[in-house]
Amino acid sequence: MTHSLPELLAPAGGREQLEAAVLYGADAVYLGGSALSLRAKCRGFDGPELADAIAFAHRSGVRVYYCLNALPFDEHLPAVEEQLERLPELGADGLIAADPGVIRLAGRLCPSVELHLSTQAHSVNAAAVEFWKEVGVRRINLARELGKDAMTALIRRFPDMDFEVFVHGAMCLSLSGHCLISAWVNNRPANLGLCTQPCRFDYRGIRLTVEEAVRRDGPFLDVTQEEDFSAVWAPMDLCLVRWMRDIVRMGPSALKLEGRTKSGGYVAQVTDAYRTALNLASSEQEEISADDFVTELFHTASRPLCSGFFLPERRVERPPRNFTAHPVVARVLAPAGNDGWRIQARSPWNADSDAELLLPGMKRPVLRAGSYALENHRGEKTDRLNPGMEGVVHLDAPDLRPGMYIRLRPESAPHSPEAEA
């Protein structure tokens, strides 16, 4: 039986991330404004920027879903209504919401815009699907707390509904993101997009001992201590690239990548890996192994990767032995002469370092030191570009395009806290 490929839905926290998602193979992007989209830290799109972003995506054949998935208080509703009224004229392909009040307002103020239910709504059973279907929701993002079999059962029970599955990115400590830690500790409510992620902070326990009396087949809590502090609450990140064929057979309409606060380099690498894995999932070819995809994603990872609740027993991914992450070293901006490209450095780039091009399709041609030359913004030959500096790289790369990225090879990548993932 042949299964159609699900839509690949990538995050677009800003213009660069939008361009990266489109260039590296997303079928659709999700974005929001500067408020009420659950990502107050990302710049988002407002006014003319939003209209231009939607038009840009549509010219590339990419759909755009607008996030209004915060859980607003009464004082926020006028702003919600204003945003909803503008969506039809802007041409948004869908609205992502979680709050029943927002969904009801959307049905009245922008009935032509397709309604998608956010993961914040925590949809885990058939009765909930029936309810959301009755109030006009077309697509439901299934809760990360569901396993493969439970998701498959819901997808097959409701063939007239679209279902979306998160396959990669951060997982919240609490149920479907309904966390109060940030609001309690820092007066920054996560459900209004202001999460400070205190679950990722490092803590030191004073006179604290944790034991679990029943489960004695291993540690209840694995704590790694660095400089006397530990990230005791931080969940691992989700990574389901290894199971692409299984997920395609489940029949979801879309696969979602988390990361609206991430960099353009992150979006490029993660989108490229999942786009390539999806394309290969529709064939019997094994051009790239599952281990290779996981290794590629470790270049973007800031936390351990795992299968979450997808499998009955969680699988934790381990990087290959002696693995070193490749930092993104530059973004390509525009052509500069016959063999040159104007670039912006994202990490320290020394001209005696090997590098590799990030070409769509998981193609990673190597640039050996000596096969390319760097210039600063004045056109002078240089041995080093620092983060934020613009310059020119001269190289032989006919497949390179504006918006693509270059990263260092591991054996030559200097450690730098400034390096972009």
Which residues make up each language-model segment?
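Surface-exposed amphipathic alpha-helical tracts and adjacent flexible/coil segments at the periphery
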Residues: M1-L23, A28-Y30, A35, I54, ...
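Short beta-strand elements of ligand-binding domains
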Residues: Y66, A97, L117-T119
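Gly/Gly-Pro- and Ser/Thr-rich, intrinsically disordered tail segments characteristic of DNA damage-repair
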Residues: P78, V113, L117-A126
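Alpha-helix capping/helix-boundary segments
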Residues: G101-V102
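Conserved phosphotransfer cores of two-component systems
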Residues: C110
